[in-house]
């Protein structure tokens, strides 16, 4: 059997991080079996569905590195097919027209509540003849759900889940305006698309029971189902805005690499031994829905940062440079940095990357670590830098300025030799010199190695910054 999975988002907003993991699991399972993953846009809610959201979903999938087969399928464009199936179910005696008015339905619900029953439709039109239909009322179509026993959802993650049929009632499959409900549209589309495996969030389990009833009514084979646990926040609560970023686009703007996010997401609910860093090739080779956990996975930014830091260290400098440039328009002060990135500063930034990527967990930290290159002048000092540039620090700068100025070559070896010789001669620890020098060059107490900074900035810029601090720093 050829495996065909599908990712079926609703285009009402960005690609949610939970949706990205669902897409990843579908993609991996299809790839593992040499099959296909299709993309279906569930856009039947015309009021909330937008073209911008469709674009955001497709862009999000592309960025995170998940491809789909064929063109995206619009559920809305298949409305006529959904209506055709609903009418066929009526002809086959598996569904019926219901003419109940809103007032009658409200009365049914009130009676059910008063009697302590679930507020379900009571099947009033289930066996009535159409000749009894009132004039001027457009009917809905309801499925004839089984009244006795239970509907069983056979799930590869959750096991067999039983739903008493008395709790499911004769639900609507076609509205009075001729539009299908979600339940019907999903079943028809999954059948027509040849979907063999449905991998989605476990919040769809109850839907799965109702969809099973429709599959059985049509005599169609039910795809293998795997309902995966939702992603929760670090506090164990359902993921929401208060837990931080929700959309894939936000993670991109926060400086996460797509390979790192894939690696992190695959470990949310699935694992392969104790492996933390997993290549895409190994994911495809190892992934199986039978290994997905039942319990909800918790979002852990510390772990995500650690994984992202690994991928940053393993990336080439050019790739990091390109990735960083691509997110600048999306981050705070990014446009200011773009304005300053002339040919000279681009070269300096690229040259700085090997010196700062070892300590960077995100691209934002990489940008921050290189900010001394394109910072505004006069240089703004952080509090620690101000402390380092006190009276003693200024005295150091005044002493080493002529030494640096007299260096015949501006390379790390020459600069290292000159300053260490001075420190030894003055019986000073090298850190006593390096700390105020670093503060004068970068405005911070931490940075890449001070000799690397000197070389990156170049002779003139370095001497100008040192001289500027000698002349302007106030003792605190």
Curated annotation (Swiss-Prot):
Residues annotated as binding ATP: 241
GO molecular function annotations of the record: ATP binding; glutamate-tRNA ligase activity; tRNA binding; zinc ion binding
InterPro entries noted in UniProt: aa-tRNA-synth_I_cd-bd (IPR045462), aa-tRNA-synth_I_codon-bd_sub2 (IPR020751), aa-tRNA-synth_I_CS (IPR001412), aa_tRNA-synth_I_cd-bd_sf (IPR008925), Glu-tRNA-ligase_bac/mito (IPR004527), Glu/Gln-tRNA-synth (IPR000924), Glu/Gln-tRNA-synth_Ib_cat-dom (IPR020058), GluQ/Sye (IPR049940)
Keywords for the protein's UniProt record, in alphabetical order: Aminoacyl-tRNA synthetase, ATP-binding, Cytoplasm, Ligase, Nucleotide-binding, Protein biosynthesis
Gene3D superfamilies reported in the protein's UniProt record: 1.10.10.350, HUPs
Subcellular location as annotated: Cytoplasm
GO biological process, one term: glutamyl-tRNA aminoacylation
EC number(s) from the headed UniProt entry: 6.1.1.17
Motif ('HIGH' region): 9-19
Subunit annotation: Monomer.
GO CC field: cytosol
UniProt motif ('KMSKS' region) ranges: 238-242
Signal peptide stretch: none
Protein name: Glutamate--tRNA ligase 1
Reactions catalysed, as given in the entry: tRNA(Glu) + L-glutamate + ATP = L-glutamyl-tRNA(Glu) + AMP + diphosphate
Function of the protein: Catalyzes the attachment of glutamate to tRNA(Glu) in a two-step reaction: glutamate is first activated by ATP to form Glu-AMP and then transferred to the acceptor end of tRNA(Glu).
Species the sequence originates in: Bartonella bacilliformis (strain ATCC 35685 / KC583 / Herrer 020/F12,63)
One Pfam family linked to the record: tRNA-synt_1c
């Amino acid at each position: 059997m050829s495996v065909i999975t599908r990712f079926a988002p609703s285009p009402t907003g960005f690609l949610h991080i939970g949706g990205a993991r669902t897409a990843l699991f579908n993609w991996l399972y299809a790839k593992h079996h040499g099959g296909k993953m299709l993309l279906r846009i569930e856009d039947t809610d015309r009021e909330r569905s937008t073209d911008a959201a469709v674009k955001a979903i497709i862009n999000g999938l592309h960025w995170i590195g998940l491809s789909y087969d064929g063109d995206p399928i619009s559920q809305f464009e298949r409305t006529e097919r959904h209506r055709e199936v609903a009418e066929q179910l009526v002809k086959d005696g598996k569904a019926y027209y219901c003419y109940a008015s809103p007032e009658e339905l409200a009365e049914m619900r009130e009676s059910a509540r008063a009697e302590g029953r679930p507020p379900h439709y009571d099947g009033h039109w289930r066996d009535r003849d159409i000749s009894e239909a009132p004039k001027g009322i457009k009917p809905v179509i309801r499925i004839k759900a089984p009244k006795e026993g239970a509907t069983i959802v056979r799930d590869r993650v959750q096991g067999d889940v039983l739903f008493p049929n008395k709790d499911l009632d004769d639900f609507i499959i076609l509205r009075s305006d001729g539009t299908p409900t979600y339940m019907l549209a999903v079943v028809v589309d999954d059948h027509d698309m040849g979907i063999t495996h449905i991998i989605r969030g476990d919040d769809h389990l109850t839907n799965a029971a109702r969809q099973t009833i429709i599959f059985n009514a049509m005599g169609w084979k039910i795809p293998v189902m795997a309902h995966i646990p939702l992603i929760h926040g670090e506090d164990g609560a359902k993921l929401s805005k208060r837990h931080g970023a929700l959309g894939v686009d936000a993670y991109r703007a926060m400086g996460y690499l797509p390979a790192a996010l894939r690696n992190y997401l695959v470990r949310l609910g699935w694992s392969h031994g104790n492996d933390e860093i997993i290549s895409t090739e190994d994911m495809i080779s190892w992934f199986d829905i039978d290994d997905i956990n039942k319990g909800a996975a918790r979002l852990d930014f510390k772990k995500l940062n650690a994984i992202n830091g690994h991928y940053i260290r393993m990336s080439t400098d050019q790739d990091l440079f390109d990735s960083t440039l691509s997110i600048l328009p999306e981050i705070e002060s990014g446009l200011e940095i773009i304005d300053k990135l002339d040919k000279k500063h681009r070269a300096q930034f690229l040259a700085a990357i090997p010196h700062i990527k070892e300590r960077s967990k995100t691209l934002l930290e990489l940008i921050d670590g290189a900010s001394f290159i394109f910072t505004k002048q006069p240089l703004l000092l952080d509090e620690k830098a101000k402390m380092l540039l006190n009276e003693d620090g200024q005295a150091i700068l005044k002493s080493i300025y002529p030494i640096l100025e007299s260096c015949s070559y501006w390379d790390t070896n020459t600069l290292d030799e000159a300053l260490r010789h001075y420190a030894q001669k003055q019986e000073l620890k090298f850190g006593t010199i390096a700390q105020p020098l670093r503060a004068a060059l970068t405005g911070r107490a931490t940075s890449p190695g001070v000799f690397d900074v000197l070389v990156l900035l170049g002779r003139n810029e370095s001497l100008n910054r040192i001289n500027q601090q000698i002349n302007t720093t106030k003792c605190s």
